Amino acid sequence: MRNLITIVGLLFVLQTNAQQVNYLNQGNATAKATVFAQGIISDGLINRDFTISPKGDEIFFTIQHKDFISSTIMHIQLKNGKWNEVQVAPFSGMYSDLEAQFSPDGKKIFFSSNRKVDAMDSINDYDMWYVEKTANDSWGKPVHLGFTVNSPHDEFYPSIAKSGNLYFTAQLDNGVGKEDIFMCEFKNGEYQSPVPVSTAVNSKGYEFNAFVDPDEQFILFTGYGRKDDMGKGDLYISKKNEKGEWQEAKNLGALINSKGLDYCPFVSWDKRTLFFSSNRNINAGPYEKPVTASVLKTQLSSPGNGLDDIYWIKFDELLKQF
């Protein structure tokens, strides 16, 4: 009996530890969407598209110039129990790179970049690339995903399922609307040609920046211009039914969406926390009394100033409501 109690207790401890992720020493998300890692990631600049490794020891996000002039992927790593300083990712810094996402096994990072495929490349578009983890715990050289996946047009926001299927944003001739979510099936070790995701997700308008559940049971994305749009683009969810078909997408609601643009969703690997980008302005007046110059300058240069920040919210219970 004592041995049984010991085993049960050990299993509980192991399960608890497995569920605990150190999100930059920020504690846990709450039922209200709040700025994530203020002063570390969200710092008053344009910070967007967050991802964390399956082991919870690496974070990537993007810093972007205004008007999408250029963007750079940033990197933070947990070593010896401590997070290091924010640095430019080892595979970024020269070109306009953004939207890094881990493969479910943590061995690859997929991202979008306008770097040229070779010296003969004359098309200035964004393609999808990947890097692989090296033996010394770094990242290798970027590899182009090839022209079955990539086109002469832009491809953005890769999201990879356990099956290997690749979801991304593009404007292709076989699309449904003005911008759509596409999927490339991974079959026999190769990516197949992109096909648009169901019209339960895609519309005649704009759908972009989709996160697919690694098990492909739900998908989150931004829709713009829909009848129930609360602002300049809202986050939506679609789940699969028992037949494996995507159901009609639903707006995630006012707990998450705002009057601004809400986009770039990422759900933690334990499916408890949603991270997303938003350019909502939470610092603007009106004020209860005249504001001082010092307070005004602080607000204008802090997260929530209308530039893009990373937000997070407790998601597991919310997910059950859809």
What are these regions (language model features)?
Residues 1-21:
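Bacterial Sec-dependent N-terminal signal peptides
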Residues 19-322:
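Short, conserved micro-motifs composed of acidic
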